């Protein structure tokens, strides 16, 4: 069967396909397949080619009923005579089979019986369908037309019976139709079979019965049509009369059956329409299944075919005639032959079924959808529906009107244009322009009561003009918007087919409704509808004519309307300006009008007071409309005209100073968009000029386009750049936008340098970078963002490399150094409570990201790469940590300097290094004031400490030493440190404690590297040590707590520092001078902690004889004069360390120096503190007898001098104490002891 149906699809309209003799299953209605693609079953009348054969008057089934006999209802019949001899019997059997099928419907259809019932029902249906097809074939092949002369001769009995067959068929077909009744009158269980879905393809008897009824209704029409085509005359029935009481004929039966079939189909559709929401009207079909849809298509093709060759009604006439009866007030007024159910909403139903039936015209004779097919229209009836829809007396609701117009819009898409439709609708909407056309319970998606912007106005118009219809149009648009869609579609179609005449008709109708009184009556909603209408007309027709008329009409608006609806009027006018730009037309007229109005409002905004919030808000609303609209104009225009310059007038110069921060953001966003567009257009022109084979005419044209571009650029320099320049040191302008706008102007100067103002000439790029990138007084947030924009633009640095500014990279590096150092400058505060906060957390994430980006780009500079390369650092630092990257860069600079050999190279490197730093102390000065930032101080002291240490060799030069002196004075020896009554702030002291070793080591290296001794530098180093030894001493004199003392950390002689001798020397001097100096017999403060520090100093460093000479007298003095146990203990430990440094037997050097120191000690304290002296020397003797033995003469002489002084003879107690000392000194001591006893 599939092969036959497929083949029949390709039958030509003039030839009948010669098929084999294989029996093909006759076509029938079937929805037992997946029809989601909209295709019909291969068994259908359309797909099988049955409809085409019917219309072309071809053999209905050329491969069937070819045998001598045919099986009908289980019996064998002679094919060529069965219908003549047994017509009534066959129809009786047919009705009996229908009865049998109806009986099966009554049987309970459970799952166990479904297969059996399906098989029986399907067999009955097939027998009935085969019989009806047999009638068609018999009429076409076997029925002979009775000629006139045959009535004069005696007829053969068969001929006599054959002559009666047509009348008998008419009677039997009428009887069959009466027997099966109307589809609409079927029991609900049978009608419910339409929606039966069964994946197993097993259907209940009700499904088969329903589809057999459909087959019967359609095949009766086929039989009557074939009968009429065969006989070419009217056939009268003998048993029945027609509905009008006249004789029944094949023609009247056909018409009667058509009417009944239409009624049935309409009733089935009415049942579905009652469940359809207005918003779903176009989504839900009127057909319960594909078989009903096919029946509609069959009727369309058959009735329209008959209309071509006879006076019969077309399909639309049949449908219109019956739908009109729905509007009759009572069933009494309807024709008795029409049995239609009373519709709840006849108007809505008529729209709904009309649009769905119209779509079926796209389906051809084979059941294939062809959207390009010319469709038969039904505008006369649709016009009637439109008039009913917009009749005020009927009070049609908006939700209903939307559905009606949505259907109308779809029909406009199907059919040829009809200006009358627009005329009818405009008559209604012209009277209701002030209506919002809204549905209270349904908010419009994407559409507020008042359009938000000019661009949204154009977007609305563009959507209305789109050929693609929005499936959600009902919910997203009002009925007025749908009317605009209809207007656009009709006018566009009509102008394509008929030229400008339809547009002139529409224009006349619409223009005539607007006059001064009407314009004055428009509310805000009305004005919005007014602009939407005329924007749409401008989009589809003559924009200049429409725009000119709009300008004339706007003059009719009263001043009160302009003040209350000014924003909407501005939006509408700006929308026209945008449309001109989109169509690449000269915007001169609109630009001049709008720019003048903008200038006036900007002046009012400038002089308005800050407390006049309502007025300012109203003015700002208008100004925003202008700004947004002009931005769209520039972004939309493919080329710029001289009139574009008018849009950038003095109004901006007045507006900018009056703006607050949020308002400035809006204006600067506009500025950046316009700058980007100008540069884009300029680059396009340059590319076109650079093409090969450009003739002089084209060059002249491109040059002409360049002139208005330069004029627009000049306007931006005048009105915007001067303001940015004046605000670059303030925080009035948002910093990020200030940087972005300045970068955009820099790029504009690169592309179009001649447009820059005179004060930036002759090198505008360098001048702007100097203002916003290299100037130390600009906020670092601005500099970082600004330079990041430029560093990633190769064109900028090409311009810089060609300029006379040879140190551009050095200046950029200097700016980067400042940006890193000042990353915490915005977080200064009086009470700094963030000492332990992670420094990175104290910086805005945005600025850290910007710094990281700037660092990444900076490391691409050739100068930076060269520094790292010479320092033999292959892996560049990670830009994600700008602080660490700066540290590594500074260290690399120091390493690079140390690798240089010649004096000239070193001198140049020192100069370059100082350029990198610039006024570095000014960068960090904010952290050192009254307002502090712990994170900022930690950053400052850390990086500057690294700088001092890693650049020590550079600071050893005369060029750089001044900076080192200033660093020491500013960071380590500020005035607060030198004032005894003032304490350093806690965060500063913490930062110094962490970084002091770096400074001390660096200064020490400088001292070692200096070619000439620098007394001032040495004095500074000693002052630093003096100030901070005591400040960082622990509260308890515990040696273990002194391990992290910054001075001791510095003295631990790291491998990177060759010699710590100067540092140790100055440390010892500082201790001797400031921490071991007694005032009379009063010990210095915190003596125990100082002694602990000295003890740790001896352990950590290699002390020399000169160090002993300075420290030992003070230690000995402590042992003599202080009785505090902790002091004595620590002093003793110090004494032991000092003695241990002088090994026994050493000749000269430390041992001799030590002996000399003790001899002086004995002379100073021997007479008054003899017992303490002897005790101290006993301790020394346990470590180094040799030293004490050398002191025996001095001790003996001191003893005698003491006794002589007191004049009391021998001092027995003192001599005993001295004897104890001598007892521990071996033979020498014993000998001295004996001499004393004599």
Swiss-Prot record:
Keyword DNA damage: yes
Function text: Component of the MMS22L-TONSL complex, a complex that promotes homologous recombination-mediated repair of double-strand breaks (DSBs) at stalled or collapsed replication forks. The MMS22L-TONSL complex is required to maintain genome integrity during DNA replication. It mediates the assembly of RAD51 filaments on single-stranded DNA (ssDNA): the MMS22L-TONSL complex is recruited to DSBs following histone replacement by histone chaperones and eviction of the replication protein A complex (RPA/RP-A) from DSBs.
Protein name (database record): Protein MMS22-like
Main location as per UniProt: nucleus
Gene Ontology BP annotations: chromatin organization; double-strand break repair via homologous recombination; protein localization to chromatin; replication fork processing
Post-translational modification remark: Degraded by the ubiquitin-proteasome system upon replication stress.
Record-level GO cellular component terms: cytosol; FACT complex; MCM complex; nuclear replication fork; site of DNA damage; site of double-strand break
Compartment annotation: Nucleus; Chromosome
Subunit structure and binding partners: Component of the MMS22L-TONSL complex, a complex at least composed of MMS22L and TONSL/NFKBIL2. Interacts with RAD51; interaction is direct.
PANTHER family tied to this protein: PROTEIN MMS22-LIKE
Organism taxonomic ancestry: Eukaryota, Metazoa, Chordata, Craniata, Vertebrata
Taxonomy, superkingdom: Eukaryota
Organism of provenance: Mus musculus (Mouse)
Family designation: Belongs to the MMS22 family. MMS22L subfamily.
Keyword flag Transmembrane: no
Single GO MF descriptor: single-stranded DNA binding
InterPro entries for this protein: MMS22-like, MMS22L_C, MMS22L_N
Keywords on record: Chromatin regulator, Chromosome, DNA damage, DNA repair, DNA-binding, Nucleus
């Amino acid at each position: 069967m599939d092969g036959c149906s497929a083949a029949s699809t390709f039958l030509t309209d003039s030839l009948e396909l010669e098929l084999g003799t294989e029996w093909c299953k006759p076509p029938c209605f079937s929805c037992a397949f997946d029809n989601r693609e909209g295709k019909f079953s291969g068994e259908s009348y359309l797909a099988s080619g049955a409809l085409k054969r019917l219309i072309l008057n071809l053999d209905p089934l050329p491969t069937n009923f070819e045998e001598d006999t045919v099986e009908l209802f289980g019996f064998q019949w002679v094919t060529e005579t069965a219908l003549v001899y047994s017509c009534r019997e066959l129809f009786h059997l047919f009705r009996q089979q229908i009865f049998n099928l109806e009986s099966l419907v009554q049987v309970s259809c459970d799952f166990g019986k479904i297969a059996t019932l399906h098989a029986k029902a399907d067999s009955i249906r097939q027998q009935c369908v085969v019989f009806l097809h047999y009638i068609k074939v018999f009429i076409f092949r076997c029925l002979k037309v009775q000629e006139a002369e045959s009535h004069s001769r005696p007829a053969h009995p068969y001929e006599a019976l054959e002559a009666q067959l047509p009348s008998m068929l008419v009677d039997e077909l009428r009887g069959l139709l009466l027997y099966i009744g109307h589809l609409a009158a079927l029991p609900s269980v049978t009608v419910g079979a339409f929606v039966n879905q069964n994946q197993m393809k097993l259907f209940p008897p009700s499904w088969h019965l329903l589809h057999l009824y459909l087959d019967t209704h359609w095949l009766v029409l086929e039989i009557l049509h074939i009968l009429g085509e065969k006989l070419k005359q009217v056939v009268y029935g003998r048993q029945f009369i027609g509905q009008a009481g006249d004789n029944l004929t094949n023609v009247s039966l056909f018409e009667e059956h058509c009417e009944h079939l239409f009624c049935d189909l309409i009733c089935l559709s009415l049942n579905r329409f009652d469940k359809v929401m207005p918003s779903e009207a176009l989504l839900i079909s009127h057909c319960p299944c594909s078989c009903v849809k096919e029946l509609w298509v069959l009727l369309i093709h058959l009735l329209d075919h008959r209309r071509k060759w006879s006076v019969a009604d077309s399909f639309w006439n049949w449908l219109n005639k019956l739908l009109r009866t729905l509007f009759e007030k009572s069933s009494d007024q309807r024709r008795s032959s029409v049995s239609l159910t009373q519709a709840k909403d006849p108007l809505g139903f008529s729209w709904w079924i009309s649009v769905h039936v119209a779509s079926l015209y796209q389906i051809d004779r084979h059941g294939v959808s062809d959207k390009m097919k010319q469709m038969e229209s039904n505008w006369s009836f649709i016009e009637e529906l439109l008039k009913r829809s917009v009749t005020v007396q009927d009070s049609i609701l908006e939700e209903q009107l939307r559905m009606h117009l949505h259907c109308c819009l779809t029909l406009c898409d199907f059919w040829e244009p009809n200006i009358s439709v627009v005329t009818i609708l405009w008559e209604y909407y012209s009277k209701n322009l002030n209506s919002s056309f809204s549905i209270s319970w349904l908010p419009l998606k994407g559409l507020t009561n008042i359009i938000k912007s000019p661009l949204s106005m154009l977007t609305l118009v563009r959507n209305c003009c789109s050929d693609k219809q929005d499936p959600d149009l009902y919910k997203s648009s009002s009925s007025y918007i749908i009317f605009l869609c209809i207007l656009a579609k009709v006018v566009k179609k009509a102008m394509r087919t008929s030229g400008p005449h339809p547009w002139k008709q529409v224009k006349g109708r619409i223009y005539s409704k607007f006059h001064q009184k009407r314009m004055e009556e428009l509310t805000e909603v009305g004005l919005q509808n007014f602009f939407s209408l005329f924007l749409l007309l401008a989009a589809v027709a003559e924009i200049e004519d429409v725009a000119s008329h709009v300008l004339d009409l706007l003059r009719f608006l009263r001043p009160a309307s302009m003040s209350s609806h000014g924003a909407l009027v501005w939006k509408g006018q700006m929308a026209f300006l945008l449309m001109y730009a989109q169509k690449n037309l000269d915007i001169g007229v609109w630009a001049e009008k709008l720019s003048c109005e903008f200038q006036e409002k900007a002046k009012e905004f400038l002089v308005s007071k800050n407390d006049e919030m309502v007025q300012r808000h109203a003015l700002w609303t208008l100004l925003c409309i202008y700004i947004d609209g002009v931005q769209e104009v520039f972004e939309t225009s493919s080329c710029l005209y001289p009139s574009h310059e008018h849009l950038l007038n003095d109004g901006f110069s007045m507006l900018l100073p009056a703006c607050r921060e949020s308002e400035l953001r809006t204006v600067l966003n506009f500025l950046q968009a316009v700058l980007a567009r100008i540069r884009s257009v300029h680059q396009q022109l340059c590319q076109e000029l650079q093409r090969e084979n450009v003739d002089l005419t084209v060059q002249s044209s491109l040059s002409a386009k360049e002139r208005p571009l330069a004029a627009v650029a000049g306007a931006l320099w005048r009105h915007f750049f001067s303001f940015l320049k004046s605000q670059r040191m303030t925080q009035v302008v948002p910093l990020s936008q200030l940087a972005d706008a300045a970068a955009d102007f820099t790029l504009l100067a690169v592309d179009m340098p001649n447009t820059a103002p005179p004060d930036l000439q002759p090198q505008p790029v360098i001048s702007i970078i100097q203002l916003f990138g290299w100037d130390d007084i600009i906020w670092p947030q601005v500099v970082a963002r600004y330079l990041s924009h430029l560093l990633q633009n190769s064109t900028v640095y090409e311009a810089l490399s060609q300029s006379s500014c040879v140190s551009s990279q050095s200046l950029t590096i200097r700016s980067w150094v400042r940006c890193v150092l000042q990353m915490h400058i915005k977080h200064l505060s009086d009470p700094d409570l963030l000492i332990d906060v992670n420094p990175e957390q104290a910086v805005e994430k945005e600025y850290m990201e910007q710094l990281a980006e700037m660092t990444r780009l900076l490391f691409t500079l050739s100068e930076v790469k060269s520094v790292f390369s010479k320092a033999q650092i292959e892996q560049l630092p990670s830009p994600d940590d700008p602080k660490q990257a700066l540290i590594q860069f500074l260290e690399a600079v120091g390493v690079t300097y140390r690798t240089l050999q010649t004096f000239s190279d070193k001198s140049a490197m020192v100069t370059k290094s100082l350029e990198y730093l610039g006024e570095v102390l000014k960068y960090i000065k904010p952290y050192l004031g009254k307002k502090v930032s712990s994170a900022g101080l930690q950053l400052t002291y850390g990086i500057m400490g690294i700088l001092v240490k890693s650049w020590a060799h550079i600071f050893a030069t005369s060029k750089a030493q001044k900076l080192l002196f200033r660093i020491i004075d500013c960071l380590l020896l500020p005035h607060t440190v030198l004032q005894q009554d003032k304490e350093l702030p806690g965060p500063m002291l913490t930062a110094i404690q962490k970084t002091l070793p770096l400074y001390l080591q660096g200064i020490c290296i400088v001292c070692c590297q200096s070619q000439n001794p620098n007394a001032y530098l040495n004095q500074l180093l000693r002052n630093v040590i003096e100030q901070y030894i005591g400040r960082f001493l622990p509260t308890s004199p515990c040696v273990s707590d002194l391990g992290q003392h910054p001075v001791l950390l510095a003295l631990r002689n790291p491998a990177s520092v060759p010699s710590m001798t100067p540092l140790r020397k100055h440390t010892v001097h500082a201790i001797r001078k400031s921490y071991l100096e007694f005032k009379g017999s009063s010990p210095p403060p915190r003596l125990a902690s100082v002694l602990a520090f000295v003890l740790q100093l001896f352990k950590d460093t290699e002390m020399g004889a000169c160090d002993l000479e300075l420290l030992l007298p003070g230690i000995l003095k402590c042992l003599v004069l202080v009785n505090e146990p902790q002091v004595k203990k620590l002093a003793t430990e110090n004494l032991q360390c000092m003695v241990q440094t002088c090994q026994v037997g050493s000749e000269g050097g430390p041992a001799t120096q030590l002996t000399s120191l003790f001899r002086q000690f004995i002379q100073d304290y021997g007479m008054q503190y003899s017992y303490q002296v002897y005790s101290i020397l006993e301790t020394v003797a346990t470590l180094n007898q040799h030293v004490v033995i050398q002191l025996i003469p001095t001790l003996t002489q001191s003893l005698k001098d003491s006794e002589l002084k007191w004049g009391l003879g021998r001092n027995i107690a003192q001599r005993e104490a001295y004897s104890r000392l001598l007892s521990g000194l071996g033979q020498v001591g014993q000998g001295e002891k004996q001499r004393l006893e004599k």
